């Protein structure tokens, strides 16, 4: 076995208890998007104890350079997100959230502690590789406009510019000990839709004297689904979902207006723009044709996430070296959004999945739920894997 590979594996195992301790500290002290002040302080302290210098960016983010021999030969970036969610944790564990109403329910505590472990490993062996590893500890993945977009605007991908960037995310549907990859299109763009349908309210017994916004809204919801089924290229995944409709009328009261909220997800930027334009035109036109009006607002979210095929193939091969072929799986397209996507439109990128599921331990709950947790044995190999992927790419 490659001596450096064996060393990285051994170091990852040796620091696993420390990695778990870091994860538990972060889990117990979660902070919301753009508010990761104490998280930044903790991560910075951990890095400084390793002898690494940190540069603050995007208010609560950090950039760290680990330079090997001949630092300018090649640069590879590794990214972890650090923010938590507005969820009340129901887990009965020693590391339960101590911040009321805030919880690490999406594994960002895992991502951050894992990247700290990778930093620890890479810093110990920096005399054994050529090039530079650039670490991005990023705030605010969970909230638009996304910490990644701010990091990029403030120069996270410059000075030095990485040849590629890697990111990992926990996967509740993948057993612990396994890793998932997908080439090309992987995750969707996500835009939030806010519609206000206005009519004329009145008594439910006299609809002829009203302009019923509930009927108008119902037609709009159904008709907009036809944009997905009839106007979209059938080879491109896309989803339109309405999750909230609010009329505030009563059994005998027709309201003045109805509010509708939903999301539009796509895997192609041209179709994303075209679909949104068609939806706006349809909603406004249909409301007008029925005597009402519609205000159509879009909160633009993240672009679709595309994994560079060549880089992803190399990372999958390196993961097989580290984990064994039986523990590296292929992923399906996932229609959720992720702000790592911003990086993928600026530099070659690979976003992969770290399995954390363990049915025997009852670790089966999904992300963004109050009882989400992980099998912490994932932190025995997670830091080493990311370090090895970076080293492999430096040598490619």
Predicted segment positions?
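Histidine-centered active-site/metal-ligand motif
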Residues: 25-29, 104, 108-111, 169, ...
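Acidic/His- and Gly-rich active-site-bordering loop/insert found
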Residues: 2-104, 113-116, 120-129
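Short, small-residue-enriched loops and turns at beta-alpha junctions
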Residues: 29-34, 84-86, 143, 248-251, ...
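Histidine/acidic-residue-rich, glycine-tolerant segments that coordinate divalent metal ions
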Residues: 85, 91-103, 110, 116, ...
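Non-cysteine beta-strand/loop elements that form the S-adenosyl-L-methionine
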Residues: 79, 88, 193-195, 351-357
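Divalent metal-coordination and catalytic microenvironments
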Residues: 26, 47, 78, 108, ...
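Metal-dependent amide/peptide-bond hydrolase catalytic core
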Residues: 218-396
């Amino acid at each position: 076995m490659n001596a450096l590979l064996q060393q990285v594996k051994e170091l990852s195992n040796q620091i696993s208890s420390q990695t778990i301790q870091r994860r538990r500290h972060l889990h117990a002290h979660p902070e919301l998007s753009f508010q990761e002040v104490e998280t930044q302080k903790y991560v910075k302290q951990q890095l400084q104890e390793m002898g690494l210098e940190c540069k603050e960016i995007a208010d609560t983010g950090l950039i760290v350079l680990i330079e090997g021999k001949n630092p300018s030969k090649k640069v590879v970036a590794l990214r972890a997100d650090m923010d938590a969610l507005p969820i009340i944790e129901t887990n009965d564990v020693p590391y339960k959230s101590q911040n009321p109403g805030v919880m690490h329910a999406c594994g960002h505590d895992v991502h951050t502690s894992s990247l700290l472990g990778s930093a620890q490993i890479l810093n110990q062996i920096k005399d054994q590789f050529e090039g530079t590893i650039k670490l991005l500890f990023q705030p605010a993945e969970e909230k638009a406009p996304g910490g990644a977009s701010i990091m990029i605007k403030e120069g996270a991908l410059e000075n030095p510019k990485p040849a590629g960037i890697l990111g990992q995310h926990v996967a509740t549907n993948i057993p612990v000990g396994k890793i998932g990859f997908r080439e090309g299109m992987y995750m969707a763009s996500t835009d939030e839709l806010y519609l206000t349908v206005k009519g004329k309210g009145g008594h439910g017994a006299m609809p002829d004297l009203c302009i019923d916004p509930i009927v108008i809204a119902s037609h709009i919801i159904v008709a907009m689904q036809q944009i997905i089924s009839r106007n979209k290229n059938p080879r491109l995944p896309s989803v339109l979902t309405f999750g909230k409709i609010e009329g505030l009328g009563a059994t005998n009261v027709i309201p003045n207006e109805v509010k509708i909220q939903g999301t539009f997800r796509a895997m192609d930027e041209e179709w994303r723009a075209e679909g949104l334009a068609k939806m706006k035109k349809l909603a406004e036109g249909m409301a007008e044709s029925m005597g009402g009006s519609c205000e159509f607002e879009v909160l633009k979210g993240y672009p679709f996430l595309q994994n560079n095929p060549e880089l992803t193939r190399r990372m999958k091969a390196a993961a097989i070296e580290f984990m064994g072929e039986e523990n590296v799986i292929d992923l399906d397209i996932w229609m959720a959004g992720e702000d790592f996507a911003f990086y993928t439109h600026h530099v070659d990128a690979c976003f992969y999945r770290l399995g954390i599921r363990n049915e025997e331990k009852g670790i089966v709950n999904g992300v963004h739920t109050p009882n989400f947790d992980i099998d912490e044995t994932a932190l025995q190999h997670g830091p080493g894997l990311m370090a090895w992927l970076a080293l492999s790419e430096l040598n490619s």
